[in-house]
Amino acid sequence: SEGIAAAFKASLTHVNVNYRYIEHELIYLLDNSDATVVMYHSEFEPFIEHIHEQLPKVKQWIEVEEGHTHSESEDSFYEELVGLGDGSPVDVKHSADDLLFLYTGGTTGMPKGVMWRHDDLFKVQGTGGSPLLGISPCADLEELLERLSTQSAPVNLPLPPIMHGTGLLSAVGAMSSGGTCVTLPSRSFEPELALANIDAHKVTSVTIVGDAFARPLLDSLNDNPQKYDISSIYAISSSGVMWTRDIKAGLLKHNVNMLLIDKFSSSEAIGLGTSIMTSDEDIDVAKFALGPACKVFNEAGIELHPGADEPG
């Protein structure tokens, strides 16, 4: 999260990297994105050291240490670099054309980089508003700042890894709304740790990927009644895989005021559709209400409207 915020503040292009990529995939992605600075965790140091010479475009490698223990790497160390700065604003000119690269998982071949303009990304995420909550978008940055000064800032907990588009964009959404992104120290998903942090930080929104996250959360809540207070949550959002009705209903028993939101999106297109379940509005199977940016076209490029007999 610190790296993302720093990149945005300095008008640098952030690139997400899947830590499960093998050597040829990683070399391809870093070369394809024209990466010049690479931040990596110390556990990957032997692997990173092996690919240095194959990536001549990279001018600086920054190792994020495990605790205060330095490896034998000759690369720069993150905490040392942070200590050299004074925290003053960076003298750069920001532009609506600043970019975020969002690389897909490579399910259709090698990873593909989606180039999101900051202005487009901010607008597609609601421009400081929320159609789901009936909050109108802001006309400009000044209106957004005024609105943020009079309302509570969101506190988001993204449970999928931030290298994943779902986790990354939920973190960016929270930060661009003047809010907080809560991250967990564990290397894998631990539902009890997630619930403890929801309670401790009064998290207002949680991001998951279907039943793979929702079921363990529900099991932990059922197994530990009264241990975790999740009343601060107003929304749990999911994208990517199935989130079943029974799991949703079980979660709502622990907080009847939550919105449980299925989102229909992709790396290239955000906000195509949503489906919402609440304690007052039960649903058997998620049916998505199309977002304003969702269009369907036939083979001739003619837009099709809901109810059309023709496939698109």
What are these regions, as identified by a protein language model?
Residues K9-V82:
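Structural core segment of the AMP-binding/adenylate-forming
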Residues G85-Y103, G109-M110, E146-N156:
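Conserved pre-ATP/AMP-binding loop-to-beta segment of ANL
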Residues L99-P137:
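Conserved AMP-binding A3 loop
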